[in-house]
A protein has these predicted regions:
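Small beta-barrel nucleic-acid-binding modules, primarily SNase/OB-fold domains
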Residues: 2-170
């Protein structure tokens, strides 16, 4: 009986530790450098030590494509926050295109969250994301911020826009 309690206690401890670790954000590395390019509303280039350029895709968000409504404004918003600034990237590793996927910080500002809060990007729910972004998106939507002020037929999530373009171009 005493041995059974010890085993059950050990299993419980392992389970608790696994749950705690599972809830922690995983960061492959942290990068620091100057933002030297903004490609669109969710992709930038960071100049890091050794004069190396790293293309960074902001994790957990998806901004309108440049060719869709609000795409240029999303790029301008990211540029206003980040271009020329010293940034820190908490990287989650590469995406399927080889870009560094990560959360961008300018000082204490979480740029990914700021873009969602301003209504210039959607939360990208295709992949695991920070649930706090959901609340920021709801706030932007409810207040009519950014792209949420567009007519409903112009508020097409980028992942649907890209899919539609693939069908048309095919």
């Amino acid at each position: 009986m005493d041995m059974t309690r010890r085993i059950a206690g050990s299993e419980l401890l392992v389970l608790i530790l696994a749950l705690v670790v599972a809830g922690l954000p995983v960061s492959a590395e942290t990068l620091a450098g100057r933002v030297v390019g903004v490609h669109d509303g969710d992709t930038l280039t960071l100049l890091v030590e050794g004069n190396r350029q790293v293309k960074v895709r902001l994790a957990g968000i998806d901004a309108p494509e440049l060719s869709q409504p609000y795409g240029q404004k999303a790029k301008q918003a990211l540029s206003a926050l980040a271009f020329g600034q010293e940034a820190r990237i908490d990287s989650a590793g590469p995406d399927k295109y080889g870009r560094t996927l990560g959360t961008v910080y300018i000082g204490s500002i979480n740029v990914n969250a700021a873009l969602v809060s301003q209504g210039v990007a959607w939360v990208y729910r295709q992949y695991p994301h920070n649930a706090a972004l959901d609340g920021l998106e709801s706030g932007a939507r409810n207040s009519g911020a950014g792209l949420w002020a567009l007519p409903a037929n112009q508020r097409v999530p980028p992942w649907e826009w890209r899919h539609g373009k693939e069908l048309i171009e095919w």
